[in-house]
């Protein structure tokens, strides 16, 4: 588990904080320190093993917290607003680090946040909760395009549709034999906007190596300016 407050022990070094869960489990010192060194390197803190928390920045302290949660090799990784106490630049950096670790480790992750933009950037599926009850579970695109309740609609009202709508959602059937390029079916409009807008020809929409439709600049612009 990783929490909003890092809860590092101030009298312990980085390696001692990271190895602490293994110490509690009774793992031998040489084994727990070897494992701690592995995850310290994994989260980008190699060379800071003997630093105390007061010698680390906020982002570095959160990396120690992340390393500590990974040292026991959990099957389920639970993060409760882990980046909300960080300033915007460091927060973005930690989100990038989170994505890198997820791509590397392939763990099941439950990530708690009040920031919907953070949720759509990090999550495959999102559960929107109100008063302790789940209002809707869906992928980001479905939450924005087909909200199940008024609360979900209001919660997602201000999100940029270009961040969640995918090429396959607004593509049209193949009509021409001249194209400006290809885009993935699951790429968001934000990701393909520059590529498609800059071409006078439509782009093929691809899935598993097959052409499933086309998308042109007018369809992309409609989403960018908020026209359905």
Predicted regions and their residues:
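ABC ATPase "signature
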Residues: 137-138, 146, 214
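The conserved cystathionine-beta-synthase
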Residues: 178-210, 214-228
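Short coil-to-helix segment of the ABC ATPase nucleotide-binding domain corresponding to the Q-loop/switch region
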Residues: 12-19
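Conserved signature/switch motifs of ABC ATPase nucleotide-binding domains
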Residues: 51-54, 72
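Conserved ABC ATPase "signature" region
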Residues: 19, 23-26, 30-48
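Catalytic Walker B motif of ABC-type/P-loop ATPase nucleotide-binding domains
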Residues: 77-80
């Amino acid at each position: 588990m990783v929490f909003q407050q890092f809860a590092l022990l101030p009298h312990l070094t980085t390696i001692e904080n990271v190895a602490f869960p293994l110490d509690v489990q009774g793992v031998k010192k040489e084994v727990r320190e070897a494992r701690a060194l592995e995850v310290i390197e994994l989260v980008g803190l190699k060379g800071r093993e003997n630093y105390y928390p007061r010698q680390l920045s906020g982002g570095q302290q959160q990396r120690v917290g992340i390393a500590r949660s990974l040292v026991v090799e959990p099957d389920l990784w639970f993060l409760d607003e882990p980046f909300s106490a960080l300033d915007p630049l460091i927060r973005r950096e930690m989100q990038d680090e989170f994505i890198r670790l997820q791509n590397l480790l392939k763990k099941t992750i439950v990530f708690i946040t009040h920031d919907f933009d953070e949720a759509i950037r990090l999550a495959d599926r999102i559960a929107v909760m109100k008063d302790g009850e789940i209002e809707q579970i869906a992928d980001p695109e479905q939450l924005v395009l087909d909200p199940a309740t008024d609360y979900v609609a209001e919660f997602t009202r201000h999100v940029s549709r270009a961040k969640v709508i995918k090429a396959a959602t607004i593509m049209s059937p193949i009509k021409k034999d001249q194209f400006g390029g290809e885009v993935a079916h699951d790429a968001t409009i934000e990701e393909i906007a520059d590529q498609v807008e800059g071409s006078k020809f439509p782009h093929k929409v691809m899935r598993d190596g097959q052409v499933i439709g086309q998308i042109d600049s007018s369809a992309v612009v409609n989403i960018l300016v908020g026209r359905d």
